[in-house]
């Protein structure tokens, strides 16, 4: 007796990815793009400016070349040198955690976009710490005589990514 089982009767393979999900490699490529943009602008500034030089662009914005041995707002900048490796190690650990998150949350596009920005920014600043021993900052916004601490493209990416994480979480909470 011939077998009555045909190929069409076999269950179809299921795709484990959620509808609308993307590959983590896409988000890693995006993070790499952030790193490349950050490093490109830092190289341009380092080649075009002397340390401490400031060039006005508008009435509230200068390009400037400054170094930051600490973290945001020069936190721990005068700590004696150990902070270079502390912040480098922290950036590597955060980067590894974000890569893990990207593989765990492929169906959450806004979340993946946000953490990719944070990853790119973290890696951009880690590159500076490893190569130069400090982070290169060059964006200087001010009002009158008050200057916001100088920052860079990597810092912008981290900030935008953090804001988008908050937006993503608020959207998720609102759905439930």
Curated annotation (Swiss-Prot):
The active site is at 137, 155. Pathway: Protein modification; lipoprotein biosynthesis (signal peptide cleavage). Its main location: membrane. The chain crosses the membrane at residues 26-46, 57-77, 82-102, 111-131, 147-167. It is a multi-pass membrane protein. Signal peptide: none annotated. It catalyses: Release of signal peptides from bacterial membrane prolipoproteins. Hydrolyzes -Xaa-Yaa-Zaa-|-(S,diacylglyceryl)Cys-, in which Xaa is hydrophobic (preferably Leu), and Yaa (Ala or Ser) and Zaa (Gly or Ala) have small, neutral side chains. Disulfide bonds: none annotated. Pfam families: Peptidase_A8. Its EC number is 3.4.23.36. This protein specifically catalyzes the removal of signal peptides from prolipoproteins. Belongs to the peptidase A8 family. This is Lipoprotein signal peptidase. It comes from Cupriavidus taiwanensis (strain DSM 17343 / BCRC 17206 / CCUG 44338 / CIP 107171 / LMG 19424 / R1). The lineage of its organism: Bacteria, Pseudomonadati, Pseudomonadota, Betaproteobacteria, Burkholderiales.
């Amino acid at each position: 007796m011939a077998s009555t089982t045909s190929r069409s009767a076999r269950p179809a393979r299921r795709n484990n990815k959620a509808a609308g999900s993307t590959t983590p490699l896409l988000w890693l490529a995006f993070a790499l793009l952030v790193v490349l943009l950050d490093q490109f602008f830092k190289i341009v500034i380092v080649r075009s400016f002397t340390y401490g030089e400031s060039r006005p662009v508008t009435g509230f914005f200068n390009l400037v070349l400054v170094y930051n041995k600490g973290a945001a707002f020069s936190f721990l900048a005068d700590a004696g040198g150990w902070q270079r490796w502390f912040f480098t190690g922290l950036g590597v650990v955060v980067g590894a955690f974000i890569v893990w998150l990207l593989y765990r949350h492929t169906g959450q596009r806004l979340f993946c976009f946000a953490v990719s920005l944070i990853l790119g920014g973290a890696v951009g600043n880690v590159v500076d710490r490893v190569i130069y021993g400090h982070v290169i900052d060059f964006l200087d916004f001010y009002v009158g005589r008050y200057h916001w601490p100088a920052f860079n493209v990597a810092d912008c990416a981290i900030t935008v990514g953090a804001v988008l994480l908050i937006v993503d979480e608020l959207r998720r909470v609102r759905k439930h």
